[in-house]
Regions:
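Juxtamembrane/disordered regions of integral membrane proteins
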Residues: 1-148
């Protein structure tokens, strides 16, 4: 079993969260409902959009560490595919637990919101898996003396 690389997990989580964030902020340009995650999370944190964005990136990083520790070596396929499959886990939790807690109903109350969120989480997972999986494979391929 491969050992968890915390640095790669954190870097992958931050990068994946950033890419997902950009995609979701661009949702209206793609005909999907607006998805301002910072404002949405901030609404349950005293209205602070800044705290909402901080929470979003912390959650993305924690989810990346969970991926690296539990799922990265247990899912089939290349890193980006393993990550995309993993992206389904937080998407389902968000749609069935988080969205109703925020008053939006399951799947954000509409097909567009649920679909947009699905795309965001799949991209998050693919980026995470690509970063974590690729570097893991590269690290495994290096001879031990290359670290000198």
């Amino acid at each position: 079993m491969a050992r968890l690389n915390g640095t790669r997990a954190v870097v992958g989580g931050l990068a994946a969260t950033a890419v997902m964030t950009v995609l979701m902020l661009m949702a209206p340009a793609m005909g999907l409902p607006p998805m301002n995650i910072g404002a949405m999370l901030g609404s349950v944190m005293g209205g602070s959009v800044f705290l909402g964005w901080m929470a979003h990136f912390v959650i993305g990083t924690v989810l990346a560490i969970i991926y690296a520790a539990v799922f990265a070596t247990r899912l089939p396929g290349p890193g980006f595919l393993r990550g995309a499959l993993y992206g389904l886990v937080p998407w389902i939790v968000a749609q069935l637990v988080v969205m109703p807690m925020m008053g939006a109903g399951p799947f954000g109350g509409s097909f567009g919101a649920g679909f947009g969120s699905l795309m965001g989480h799949l991209v998050y997972g693919a980026v995470l898996g690509g970063i974590y999986g690729t570097t893991e494979a590269q690290a495994a391929a290096r001879p031990a003396h290359a670290h000198v």
